[in-house]
Amino acid sequence: ASMFKHDHYMDNGVRYPNGDGICEQLNETKCDAGFSYDRSICEGPHYWHTISKCFIACGIGQRQSPINIVSYDAKFRQRLPKLKFKPHMEKLKTEVTNHQNRAPEFEPEDGENLYVKLNNLVDGHYKFHNLHVHNGRTRRKGSEHSVNGRFTPMEAHLVFHHDEQTHFEPTRTKLGGAFPGHNDFVVVGVFLEVGDDGFGDEPDDEECKHILKGHHPDNNENGNGDNGNNGYNGDNGNNGDNGNNGYNGDNGNNGVNGNNGYNGDNGNNGDNGNNGENGNNGENGNNGENGHKHGCRVKKAKHLSRILECAYRNDKVREFKKVGEEEGLDVHLTPEMPLPPLKYRHYYTYEGSLTTPPCTESVLWVVQKCHVQVSRRVLHALRNVEGYKDGTTLRKYGTRRPTQKNKVTVYKSFK
């Protein structure tokens, strides 16, 4: 997430590292300078700090995000709050635009106010800022965070910004105060799986008009029933506690092909490849860290899937637009749509940064343990969004920052 409408990095030319792999630090000071996800150029994620002095934290920061979360190293904290919004499950009018070579963002229209308040975790009220979804260069490895070296095809981010105009509480975090200063953002991260079963046929243009306006016959993804009748357990009302067996890939096996789970690009785990959990049911299945006690049920987010499919396919979002020439697409959604069921909202939390320049180190991350499944068509549509003037799409370089190596303390709401 970024607070800026960035230029396109190609507008100012492309730089390459010298023979020693070093990029020259520019004298630029703009905070909306363009950046890239192409790892071979000086505008890419390994060299963001050289683009502008405003981006210096990207290179020397001590709490940079994303990170690989090691579940058994995370510290359990009692009385961490449930993740709830005020007003509860409010449907918002949002506008989504093409963000060039970055993830399209669903931003609330003026007058739309929704807050998250996390007592016992951080002071202050945080106002919904945007929803966006990150993807990778490959279909399997698109999440920015990983857990025990394991990635998922996408990661949704719900971004909240401290509303200092109406709520004057300081943004102090109650996690031990490892870092000075305040957390101006709360970002909720959700690991997104992809699947085919239960998502219906691809919506046509006429259906998309109704979907984007908030009309849907099965709009029940925001309920809480254990048996799926009211909601967070999929639109078919039958996935609840009697549904599928947690994180068993798209076809009920361990991972996409029933092999070693979601183990990165080539069956390895993480940006540097290890063997991690080796295809067991991991943290989202019945055999997670502690069996049933804090297991997960993978929600099929059918309604959200159709919203994202329709939005990413729409020409206003899919076609490349220069800054200042964007056309907004109106979309009705609720920020709870990407989240797991309320009873399964176990999470990891740590003090980190924005994952795009200027990499500001003022983010409290709330990363959901349990995964959510969307249709495979969502991933296809997002990867086909144009990010470049020549029609090159987001599939080429993705929109994920590599995991960062700095050491931060991670806490968790579950044992």
Swiss-Prot record:
Keyword Aminoacyl-tRNA synthetase found: no
Pfam families named among the record's database cross-references: Carb_anhydrase, Collagen
Subcellular location: Secreted, Extracellular space, Extracellular matrix
Sequence positions that bind Zn(2+): 132, 134, 157
GO CC annotation: cytoplasm; extracellular region
Tissue localization of expression: Expressed in the mantle.
Ligand binding (substrate): 355-356
Keywords on record: Calcium, Disulfide bond, Extracellular matrix, Glycoprotein, Lyase, Metal-binding, Repeat, Secreted, Zinc
Sequence segments annotated as region (Disordered): 201-297
SUPFAM superfamilies assigned to the protein according to its UniProt record, in alphabetical order: Carbonic anhydrase (SSF51069)
Glycan-bearing residues: 27
Known catalytic reactions: hydrogencarbonate + H(+) = CO2 + H2O
Biased composition, class Low complexity, residue ranges: 220-289
Record-level Gene Ontology MF annotations: carbonate dehydratase activity; zinc ion binding
Sequence repeat ranges, renumbered to this chain: 225-227, 228-230, 231-233, 234-236, 237-239, 240-242, 243-245, 246-248, 249-251, 252-254, 255-257, 258-260, 261-263, 264-266, 267-269, 270-272, 273-275, 276-278, 279-281, 282-284, 285-286, 288-290
Enzyme Commission code(s) on record: 4.2.1.1
Task of the protein: Acts as a negative regulator for calcification in the shells of mollusks. May function both as a calcium concentrator and as a carbonic anhydrase required for production of carbonate ions, which are assembled to CaCO(3) at mineralization sites. Is important for shell formation in both the calcitic prismatic layer and the aragonitic nacreous layer. Shows inhibitory activity of crystal formation when present in free state but, when attached to the insoluble matrix, may regulate the form and size of aragonite crystal.
Family classification: Belongs to the alpha-carbonic anhydrase family.
Quaternary context: Homooligomer; disulfide-linked. May also be disulfide-linked to insoluble organic matrix.
UniProt xrefs under PANTHER family: CARBONIC ANHYDRASE (PTHR18952:SF141)
Protein name: Nacrein-like protein C2
Originating species: Crassostrea nippona (Iwagaki oyster)
Record lineage: Eukaryota, Metazoa, Spiralia, Lophotrochozoa, Mollusca
